[in-house]
Each structure stands twice: as C-alpha cells, then as structure tokens.
C-alpha cells in the first residue's frame, strides 16, 4: 500500500506537475534563508518592491499557524523558439511567451488542493503572489537549487520552471534538501551587462534589466540600464541562456498553454512605443505581460529605439 506521502505525490504528477517535493517547516535548515533575506533587504536590493519585506516571508507559520508540511511543485515552460534577429523588434523573456502562468499553474493547484481538501486536509496555495519564499522551499523540498543568478535550477529541466507552493496541516515525509551544483561556474555573473548579480546568489534588482522593464514604474531608466538593454523590452533571459544546465537539460514542455502566443516572442518597437490602452488590452489580456502597463511599455520601447 502506498503511503499518504506517495499517494499525494502521485496525484500531483497525475494533475501534470513536472516536479513535486515536500519540506518540513519546523526543522532548522542550514541555508541561512532568513538572514540572507534580511541582508538583501537592508542593502536595498529589493528596489521599490515593498512587498518583499512582509513579515510573513520570514516565518511561514504566519501564513498557516497549524502548518505541518510545505509542498512545492514545478512546471516546465521551455519551448525551443527564438527571438527575431531583426533590431526593429524588442525581445520578450521566455516565461511570458505563452498564457499567463499564474492562471495555468493556479488551475492545477486548485485541482490538487480540492483533492486534498476532500480528504479532510487543510491547504493554502500560492503562485508567485503571496509572502512565501518559493525558491527557498523549492530547494528545501528537493525540487531544485537556488543558483548564483537567483533562479531555481532543476536537474531535469534547468531553470525554465514555474513554482507553486501548497501549505498543509498534514505531516508528510520530507524530501532531502537539494544540494547546489553551480560549482565554480560564473557564466551568469559574467554575462550580465549591468552587473546585477553583485556576487554569487545575490541580485540587485535596481541593476536588473528584468526588474526595470517589468516592475520599475518610473518615467525613465537609469543610464546604466538604458545603455545595456540590447533589445530587451520585457524581462531578460541572458543569465539563463548561458547557464550550462539550461544548455544541456532544457526540455520542450508538454503544456500547450506555454507555447508562444502570436507575436509574443518579439515585439515591433515602433508599434509598442505608440501602444494604446485598447491595443494593450487586446494584446496582453491573457498574458503575464499585462503586468507591464501601457506607459511602461512605451518607455521600454523608446529606450530601445
């Protein structure tokens, strides 16, 4: 007979999660997650992302007082498409080519949580929207490891994965935390044109092209960002594209929702520089790119022209 832990993992795989792991929230891990976050915040590396200092991020029991286990799941989103080499087009980060990953992953998590709830198990789930250190729990649950560029790398799919977290009041058998396999490699640090990876495992959002093109709401970019965009209009994949794990282990996803929507890989810079509210709604309504508002789209495009 299968244990409840294996039964839950099998159900997660049946629903379509490519990886699933479990961690115990009540043991002392040796990853310095709390002090690392505190140091990152005190250095100002969060820029204006004020939600990053939510106290719940330091103590997961504040999200569920009776928590007994943390389940982390991952979905592979890689497709082999490539950006246009034509300089008139701006580049979009791979994560945003398809349907909004929040919706895709949330649908699967809701099915998973409903199945658990029907067995009397309490759950709370998050998809990049709550005060949870998803990457930390992914490493603790054996799903992957936090790399030098701050992304989670899995042995099976590289770093092209979306993460979801389920908190539960059921005590389950934990997986072994994942070891780090970056070794002495520093390709991600060396490729970054703005030196946003200030040292291994620490990213200064203020210098990150992805942060600036997606989260930065200011009217203009600092010169060190503007001069190094190199066509990036929404996000940046440079530190992932050079990663040896991605070059070797990227696998095409079996989730059709993650395949590129028409025109989402590369965008005409002149068109985007004159984007209207109606065009924005029509083009990005089903995409995670809708997080970038019209004014920011125009700014991003003009900075590349």
UniProtKB/Swiss-Prot annotation:
Binding site for [4Fe-4S] cluster 2: 192, 208, 236, 239
Active-site residues, Swiss-Prot/TrEMBL: 128
Residues that, per the record, bind [4Fe-4S] cluster 1: 182, 185, 188, 243
Alphabetized InterPro entries for the sequence: 4Fe4S_Fe-S-bd, 4Fe4S_Fe_S_CS, QueG, QueG_DUF1730
Domain of life: Bacteria
Keywords: 4Fe-4S, Cytoplasm, Iron, Iron-sulfur, Metal-binding, Oxidoreductase, Queuosine biosynthesis, tRNA processing
Note accompanying the cofactor annotation: Binds 2 [4Fe-4S] clusters per monomer.
Biological processes, Gene Ontology terms: queuosine biosynthetic process; tRNA modification
Cofactor(s) needed for function: cob(II)alamin; [4Fe-4S] cluster
Top-level EC class: oxidoreductase
Pathway(s) of this molecule: tRNA modification; tRNA-queuosine biosynthesis
Cross-referenced SUPFAM superfamilies: alpha-helical ferredoxin
Catalytic activity: epoxyqueuosine(34) in tRNA + AH2 = queuosine(34) in tRNA + A + H2O
Domain 4Fe-4S ferredoxin-type residue range list: 170-202
One Gene Ontology CC term in the entry: cytoplasm
EC number(s) stated in the UniProt entry for this protein: 1.17.99.6
Subcellular location: Cytoplasm
Pfam annotation, one family: Fer4_16
Molecular functions per Gene Ontology: 4 iron, 4 sulfur cluster binding; epoxyqueuosine reductase activity; metal ion binding
Assembly description: Monomer.
Function: Catalyzes the conversion of epoxyqueuosine (oQ) to queuosine (Q), which is a hypermodified base found in the wobble positions of tRNA(Asp), tRNA(Asn), tRNA(His) and tRNA(Tyr).
Family (UniProt): Belongs to the QueG family.
Protein name: Epoxyqueuosine reductase
Organism: Atelocyanobacterium thalassa (isolate ALOHA)
């Amino acid at each position: 007979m299968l244990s409840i832990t294996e039964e839950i993992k099998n159900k997660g795989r049946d629903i379509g999660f490519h990886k699933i792991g479990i961690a115990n929230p009540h043991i002392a891990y040796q990853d310095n997650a709390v002090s690392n976050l505190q140091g990152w915040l005190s250095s100002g590396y969060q820029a204006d992302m004020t939600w990053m200092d939510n106290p719940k991020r330091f103590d997961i029991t504040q999200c569920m007082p009776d928590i007994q286990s943390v389940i982390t799941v991952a979905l592979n989103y890689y497709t082999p498409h490539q950006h246009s080499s034509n300089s008139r087009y701006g580049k979009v980060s791979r994560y945003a080519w398809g349907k909004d990953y929040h919706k895709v992953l949330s649908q699967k998590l809701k099915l998973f949580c409903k199945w658990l709830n029907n067995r009397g198990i309490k759950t709370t789930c998050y998809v990049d929207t709550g005060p949870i250190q998803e990457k930390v729990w992914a490493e603790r649950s054996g799903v992957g490891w936090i790399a030098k560029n701050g992304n989670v790398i899995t042995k099976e799919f590289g770093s092209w994965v979306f993460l979801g977290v389920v908190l539960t009041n059921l005590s389950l058998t934990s997986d072994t935390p994942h070891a780090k396999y970056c070794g002495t490699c520093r390709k991600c640090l060396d490729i970054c044109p703005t030196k946003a990876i200030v040292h291994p495992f620490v990213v200064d959002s203020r210098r990150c092209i992805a942060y600036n093109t997606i989260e930065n709401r200011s009217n203009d970019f600092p010169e060190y960002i503007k001069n190094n965009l190199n066509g990036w209009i929404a996000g940046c994949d440079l530190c992932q594209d050079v990663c040896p794990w991605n070059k070797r282990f990227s696998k095409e996803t079996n989730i059709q929702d993650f395949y590129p929507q028409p025109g989402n890989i590369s965008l005409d810079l002149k068109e985007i520089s004159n984007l209207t509210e109606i065009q924005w709604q029509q083009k990005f309504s089903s995409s995670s790119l809708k997080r970038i508002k019209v004014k920011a789209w125009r700014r991003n495009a003009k900075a590349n022209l």
